[in-house]
Design a protein with these regions (language model features):
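Bacterial N-terminal signal peptides that target proteins for export
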Residues: 1-9
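Intrinsically disordered or highly flexible coil/loop and linker segments, enriched in small
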Residues: 2-3, 17, 359
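Bacterial N-terminal signal peptides
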Residues: 8-17
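Noncatalytic, solvent-exposed loop/strand surfaces
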Residues: 21-549
Length: 549
């Protein structure tokens, strides 16, 4: 079977009004400018996506296109992680942070047989273990805290402070120095253990007890911030039976003061319409002159809010239904999806794809480009009843439009859809956009995204035209990394595919990491960091380490 497919047909181009801004837009320079404003090194990678725009595109660097984890060729160091790793690495101020489980037993008081959520800190230069923030599993079990999954979120770092969400639904601020600086930073300073292998907690906020949230399986939001505003998706979701939301009134989206943990505003717009869980992460940008924080909802809608809120409350700017109105939700056979990917901001536009918990299988997907300058309901269409063709029908959880009941949809004159990509031929597997957990990466107006069915897509970011796909023959949970003119992407077989950033297909190399790669590679300080299922690797041109079996 041919693994490479060149696409020639156009995707549905809904509107070109916002599709062309500056041809000279440089996402690398934008991210570098933001990173330079933070208390981190100028070539660090201090959060998921590098900056609040979440575009996983870094400065050009001499990153290898060949290495060997067994012989140690071009590997600076590697360090063991837990038995399962889903947290994307973050690199800041000489340290590497990654979420995993306790399978390696780094902390002296917990044997490696003790299931924990763990955020582990390593020395960037040699991979030496420094400390671990350990979180015991919730007693309610898998409905709230799935066994062995560890910490699935990435932290955000500024100076000597780090913020992330634990497996227990707690937003915590940690001292990146741990107790190695000889101090117990507060206001929280009642840690039971202050050993060097322990984390130093500055403050902690429990969303389950303090906001009434009932997270489903896991809270996996990777936080971002601007100024002192910290943005959080709570993970509020369905019960163990997957039928109802036990806490439909609890917030889905939160803005906090990152210095103190004070809640500044909340919103529960998805409400009882959450389909399953809420596992997306927010993005932030100044769009149309307005500071916007953008959240992917568990109801399949994308929401934008005024970042600072208004009078202590959330102020929604726009919302966009990312699913066809006739799609429906049902366990293991749904055509309606929610949003797991992180929205990405590029050249004034917003990009996001829809997906589902991989445990619920593959399915058709939708990739959108959205103009964020409109207001209100900016979905492509709205639903009406034939008996009242002027009043839009409010959204329903399982199916927005039921034709047999006399409902119909009409084009929304206020639509913010720029383009919609479902693939160039949805009848052909290799030319279909499937469900995705992955976040897009964009450079030179070329968008790259991997879907859960294992296809890497190259798409025109301005028009939605598909250029090519590549079948990795393995599921992909990850997102692409763009370094200079190369793309790096991992899959469940443990392969890292390396491709040229081009509308013409060019596979440069495929390198196996020895175990499944569920995370996204990152580059910091001219070093490539990759976490496979159970090990973290630092890869650099010309390096040599002992290697692993």
């Amino acid at each position: 079977m041919n693994r490479f497919y060149k696409l020639t047909a156009l995707s549905l181009l809904i509107s070109a009004a916002a599709a062309s801004q500056s041809l000279a837009f440089d996402p690398v320079a934008e991210a570098a400018k933001h990173i330079a404003s933070m208390g981190v090194g100028k070539k660090d990678w201090p959060q998921w996506g590098g900056s609040p725009s979440r575009n996983n595109t870094v400065q050009d660097a001499d990153i290898p296109i060949e290495w060997d984890v067994k012989s140690g060729q071009n590997v600076v160091w590697s360090a063991p992680l837990g038995s399962e790793t889903y947290g994307n690495p973050v690199v800041a101020n000489g340290k590497v942070f990654v979420g995993t489980n306790n399978g390696n037993g780094y902390v002296s008081r917990f044997p490696n047989t003790k299931d924990l959520g763990a955020l582990v800190c390593f020395d960037e230069k040699d991979g030496k273990f420094l400390w671990q923030h350990s979180n015991e599993k919730l007693p309610t079990g898998r409905v709230h805290d799935w066994p062995d999954q560890g910490v699935c979120a990435a932290p955000v770092v500024d100076g000597d402070r780090l913020w992330y969400i634990t497996n227990r639904g707690e937003v915590v601020c940690l001292d990146t120095e741990g107790f190695h600086d000889g101090q117990n930073d507060g206001p929280f300073n009642t840690e039971a253990y202050e050993n060097l292998d322990e984390a130093d907690v500055v403050w902690s906020f429990n969303m389950m007890s303090q906001l009434g949230v009932s997270q489903h399986n896991m809270c996996s939001c990777s936080l971002t911030y601007v100024g002192d505003l910290l943005f959080v998706s709570t993970g509020n979701g369905v019960d163990e039976g997957h039928i109802t939301l036990p806490k439909s009134e609890a917030p889905s989206f939160v803005c906090m003061n990152r210095q103190t943990g004070e809640v500044l505003w909340t919103d529960n717009s998805p409400g009882a319409n959450v389909l399953h869980g809420q596992w997306s992460s927010p993005a932030y940008g100044t769009l149309g002159g307005v500071n916007q924080v953008i959240f992917g909802g568990g109801d399949g809608w994308l929401y934008s809010f005024l970042a600072e809120g208004e009078n202590g409350k959330a102020k929604m700017l726009w919302k966009f239904d990312c699913n066809p109105k006739g799609s429906f939700y049902a366990l293991n056979r749904a055509t309606r999806n929610h949003i797991i990917a992180t929205p990405v901001i590029y050249d004034g536009l917003v990009y996001v794809g829809v997906g589902e918990d991989p445990e619920h299988g593959e399915g058709g997907g939708h990739l959108w480009c959205i103009d964020p300058t409109k207001r209100g309901d900016v979905s492509p269409t709205q639903v009406f009843h034939v008996d009242d063709p002027k009043t839009p029908i409010a959204h329903r959880r399982l199916q927005a439009m039921i034709e047999k009941d006399g409902e119909l949809e009409r084009d929304n004159p206020n639509s913010a859809a720029v383009w919609h990509h479902v693939g160039n031929d949805p009848e052909e597997f290799e030319q279909t956009m499937h469900r995705t957990c992955g976040t897009v990466a964009i450079k030179d107006d070329l968008l790259f995204v991997a879907d859960f069915s294992g296809l890497l897509h190259c798409i025109d970011a301005k028009t939605g035209q598909g250029y090519w796909t590549y079948d990795m023959f393995a599921a992909s949970w990850a997102s692409p990394l763009i370094v200079g003119n190369k793309i790096y992407i991992g899959d469940e077989d443990g392969d890292i595919g390396i491709f040229e950033v081009s509308k013409e297909f060019n596979l440069i190399a495929e390198i196996n990491m020895g175990s499944a790669v569920y995370t996204t590679p990152v580059v910091a300080n001219d070093t490539l960091f990759i976490a496979n299922r159970n090990r973290l690797f630092a890869i650099r041109q010309g390096a040599q380490s002992e290697g692993i079996e």
